[in-house]
Amino acid sequence: MTLIWRHLLRPLCLVTPAPRILEMRPFLNLGASWTSVTKLSLHTKPRMPPCDFMPERYQSLGYNRVLEIHKEHLSPVVTAYFQKPLLLHQGHMEWLFDAEGNRYLDFFSGIVTVSVGHCHPKVNAVAQKQLGRLWHTSTVFFHPPMHEYAEKLAALLPEPLKVIFLVNSGSEANELAMLMARAHSNNIDIISFRGAYHGCSPYTLGLTNIGTYKMELPGGTGCQPTMCPDVFRGPWGGSHCRDSPVQTIRKCSCAPDCCQAKDQYIEQFKDTLSTSVAKSIAGFFAEPIQGVNGVVQYPKGFLKEAFELVRARGGVCIADEVQTGFGRLGSHFRGFQTHDVLPDIVTMAKGIGNGFPMAAVVTTPEIAKSLVKRLQHFNTFGGNPMACAIGSAVLEVIKEENLQENSQEVGTYMLLQFAKLRDEFEIVGDVRGKGLMIGIEMVQDKISRRPLPREEVNQIHEDCKHMGLLVGRGSIFSQTFRIAPSMCITKPEVDFAVEVFRSALTQHMERRAK
């Protein structure tokens, strides 16, 4: 594994000699009420790996003014992590810097979005060059970046997935995929898993099956949930179910080529087809690994059988690759490939543009024709020159810097290290995932698997932040830490993250004992 340009900048050093975690920068004036982070005892301060990047001096709004503007003018739905939300100022690769100059290791990458690193120099250079040439035109005119990108993206997908619709977000992509499925099948019913997140637009809210995203009013007509085949929290699961270096602590007596949990969940899927939808359906949406629900993996072989059942009912199979694509899972470039399936439609977003608004729907010529016969689909910003130039640069960086291989190597290493914490701490119920998409589920105890109360998970989350590590949250009760760093992450940085978690968990157990 090589990360070419980074090796030129950082030849040595795993840790700084005597770091001061989250050192305050007194030259920044953010108002008298801004206070230092919580002080931690000496034994809880893992050493942060070095970073040779110096952030610019912060010269914008004071922290208190930011809070006022947020309260007065921004949607109240826009909530932030932590009791004292971070005011982030600048990013460099896997690092983020706040307005006080404090440095954080970003292990959530903008909700699984910054794929090749914050402000990657090659991506930045391409964006700046395109910015000076052509920002926006329209798809009623041709421009090279769109066609160059389409050719590159199509080359990374198997036949017959070769027709590309460019849009701007995952919700847009999934809504278009819903429209395609219904236009092609002449049916209405679409199935998705409980715990699924496929967007927050009026139509995709029907596919999303998480209580906090549901309204009392009707929405997403024709969408039906089915049981999520969760081998840790669901009724069935064993010790060989997942395509992961780390399995659940649940035991089973399955032979190597057999999975009783998979068979039981398939029976539940058949039950949904028999009782909850029409004889002919439009389609089935599935994330290769559920993201927002806490990195939930299905039993091996489940999706393959489910796809066959859906097609037997006249439906199309849609893989939501918004979080799992572009090499993040390590073993394959596309998440659906890890299940040995070929979808009829693939949606992608987030990592496709490394944080620049961009998304795509890829399908077969036959399904694409079914849509255009029904309507003239148009998207003002979809396929704009800036997005396409950046998208091409992201694909080039993934290949040139072997980031898929890095995801496999470093991700497997990280999973095995976090699994040691599961064995060490009673409140770590499960460690799961593949490549650089990892979930750490917190429980009250391993036997009951009851979720650790939110306020306790919040404190562990705060402690990680105080030590310089940023991670995400997921699952129905927000009890799972979501780990999804940029694919440029290194093993020394993983070692730091594991030690931060160990320290935060130790502090939690000490608080419990008092």
UniProtKB/Swiss-Prot annotation:
SUPFAM superfamilies xrefs: PLP-dependent transferases (SSF53383)
Modification sites for N6-(pyridoxal phosphate)lysine: K350
Enzyme class: transferase
Protein name: Alanine--glyoxylate aminotransferase 2, mitochondrial
Residue numbers of N6-succinyllysine PTMs: K71, K262, K304, K420
Location within or outside the cell: Mitochondrion
Enzyme Commission (EC) number: 2.6.1.44, 2.6.1.40, 2.6.1.18
Residue numbers carrying N6-acetyllysine: K71, K84, K262, K420
Protein source organism: Pongo abelii (Sumatran orangutan)
Subunit description: Homotetramer.
Entry function: Multifunctional aminotransferase with a broad substrate specificity. Catalyzes the conversion of glyoxylate to glycine using alanine as the amino donor. Catalyzes metabolism of not L- but the D-isomer of D-beta-aminoisobutyric acid to generate 2-methyl-3-oxopropanoate and alanine. Catalyzes the transfer of the amino group from beta-alanine to pyruvate to yield L-alanine and 3-oxopropanoate. Can metabolize NG-monomethyl-L-arginine (NMMA), asymmetric NG,NG-dimethyl-L-arginine (ADMA) and symmetric NG,N'G-dimethyl-L-arginine (SDMA).
Disulfide bonds: none
